[in-house]
Structures are given as structure tokens and as C-alpha cells.
């Protein structure tokens, strides 16, 4: 009898596990909506977005051009907070909603929300596991790891994170906005590490994409910039 009950329990656990990884259309639709709301305002402020598309975004989101310009990051952060509440609820119920559960590119929705939150340290182990299990592209793991490290004042690994600060131009004496790739640990190996992680571009090419002239800096050099 005990053996019989044990078998039933094992089958029940297996069935529950299988149910957890079954494709979930309703969850996919919810995450697609979350992903859209995460990206739409960032699309608006992207320098490559044309004026017609910007007008479409304003109409779709219900903001006037003046209203959005006055409180751009306040609006974005408010939406980020709403999205984070939703994603944390989803993670609590399903774990990371990866490729098996919601397909691609929906499997990136939770990643974007966490990447834009203040809770990267809490959820990075979950993201790393999802990447290892091929539920999300490992380049996303690398990008989040870089953001986590740089937020802690440490060197990044893959050179995915750029930044900028206002400094005094020594030649002109005027204030300039200086953009740079945040310091990298072992910069001589960065392109090899990027390739292993799945990136198709070099650190130099990635910097150019961000309109940054790539140069190697140490943490001390960046901290002493004025």
C-alpha cells in the first residue's frame, strides 16, 4: 500500500512539473502586453524613431507631446513599477517565463522588466538559470550581469554597458557631455568572452552602435573624471 501511494505521489509531482512547462497562451498574451508597455516609451525617446511614429505612440498612450516632454522619465518609471509588480507575480507562480512556457520573443519580456528595475540582484540567479537552460538567450544573461556589476561599482565582463557624465573640456574650458563604455575586467579578452556568450558584435562595434568611441578605462580613471 505504501509503495502504491508513493507511486501516485511521484506521478502527481511529474504531472505537475509537466504542466508547469506546457505552453501557456494566456500568459504569453499578458507578457506580450507587458513587453509592449516596457518598450513603447523607450521607442519614443530613441533617436532613430521618426516623428510620425512618435505621434502614433503619443496617441496610443494618451499623452500630449508637451505632457510627455515635461515628465519623460517619471512616466517611464511609473510604467516600469507597474510592470515589475506584474512580473513578480508571474515569477512567483511560474518561475521564469521562458521559451518553453511562452515562446520567443515573449520569453524576453520579464528580462526587460527586471533589467529596468532596481531588483536585478534579487532576480539575476533566476535569469542565469534560465540562460543555462536555454529558456532565454545567454546574451541577455551577460547584459544583466554587466548591469549588476556596474551598479555595484565593479568592472563589467562583456562591455555591454555605457554611461555618460558632464565634464569640463580642458581645451575649451566648457562643459561637455562625455560618453564612454564602463570599465571592463580583462579588456584584452572581452571579444573572446562576448563570442562565447553568443554576441555577434565586438565591443568596439557595440560601442559604435551606442554612438560611443570605444576606449579602455579603469575604475579609477572614470571616478576621477571631472
Region locations from a protein language model:
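A cross-kingdom marker for long, charged
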Residues: 189-226
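Bacterial Sec-dependent N-terminal signal peptides
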Residues: 1-24
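A generic alpha-helix surface/boundary motif
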Residues: 85, 187-188
